[in-house]
Amino acid sequence: MANWETVVVNTDLLICGGGFSACGAATEASYWAKKKGLKVTLVDKAALDRSGAVAMGLSAINQYVGLRDGENTLEDYIRYVRSDLMGISREDLVYNIARHVDSTVHLFEKWGLKIWKDEKGKYVHEGRWQLMINGESYKVIIAEAAKNAIAAAGGEIFERVFIVDPLMDGNKCVGAVGFSTRENKFYVFKAKAVIAGMGGAVHVFRPRSVGEGFGRSWYPPFNSGSSAYFTIKAGAEMTCQEVRFIPVRFKDAYGPVGAWFLLFKSRAISAGGGDYMVVRKAELENWKPYGLVKPIPANLRNYLGMLDTEKGLGPLYMETDEAIKNIAAQFKDDPKAFKKKMKELESEAWEDFLDMTISQAILWAAQNLKPEEKHSEIAACEPYFIGSHSGAS
């Protein structure tokens, strides 16, 4: 049996995890730690540049209030979250996140994130609260900021170290233990404060992907519920972590639908029932007041599609071809401009996947599917336990 070396690391702040939340915590904490002479240590079970839920990239930022230009107020955003989650929300926490998010986005842009802008230099919105980005390297940019901040403060980063248990002193978490996935080393991290940012939990429920596709999921398959385990073990409050998130995505490869619904204004239909948002509109009356707000809560939109599926009217489709043609129609009297716009929209459709879900682009290519010519199947994913998209906090 291999002889394992025990490595003891002493620090003031221990950050467990290496995704977006951990990198953000490291960047902010290091700023203050440097002034106070404190040490920050970050431990990632993967490699910081491409770890976490944003490892493959993103094609949009899904929360931007627009305070600088007076687009919305914090109260507007609170009302939106309350409506979308049908009243199940911790509004104090939502408010606290919302008041900081714009300045964070501006930092991302300063660090090198490409945010779409129009001819007037204004951000291009996907929807009221979303910004379009070229985000294939999103995580790399944020990881670089965290690395620089930790280095400047004299802290440490440990990669390929799998944290398995918190260290408890009574009811206080004072560190964590874990092992290297590359070397025969067992780590004992001793800290005065610990941040658990290790993602949510996937594969708790049976995945839709089976056979050769087994293991493919919308949420990263590497997220094994470590944050929940740490929280429970340490006796900390679990706010909204019980929320099960069921996103609708393009079937099989889990490509994003946000740009299609919000930017391209696409419709979703069922094979045998048509536009279920129109046909089943009366069902929304049963969910007042939330069924009557605009935009209609995401879970109710999904529910109406699932009703069609349960009645044997499925599968569901995203009308990509119709959406692209509708946008290009404004140039129908100018064949040259029409052709140019069609190519531009086709490029944006593919880029949406290449920025954040490359597997969906590969699937389209493998099927020789052209979004401007044929619609694509969409489906609800299996449920996930996930921090950020619980939305309620």
Regions found by a protein language model. Give the residues of each.
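N-terminal Rossmann-like FAD-binding beta1-loop-alpha1 element of flavoenzymes
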Residues: 13-41
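Core beta-strand elements of the Rossmann-like FAD/NAD(P) dinucleotide-binding domain
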Residues: 8-11, 182-193
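Glycine-rich loop(s) and the adjacent beta-strand/alpha-helix scaffold that form part
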Residues: 196-256
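Short, well-ordered coil/turn residues at beta-beta hairpins
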Residues: 17, 191-193, 197-198
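Glycine-rich FAD pyrophosphate-binding loop
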Residues: 32-56
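Glycine-rich active-site loop/strand segments that organize a redox cofactor
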Residues: 61-97
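Mobile, glycine/GP-rich and aromatic-enriched active-site lid/loop segments adjacent to catalytic centers
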Residues: 102, 109-164, 169, 241-393
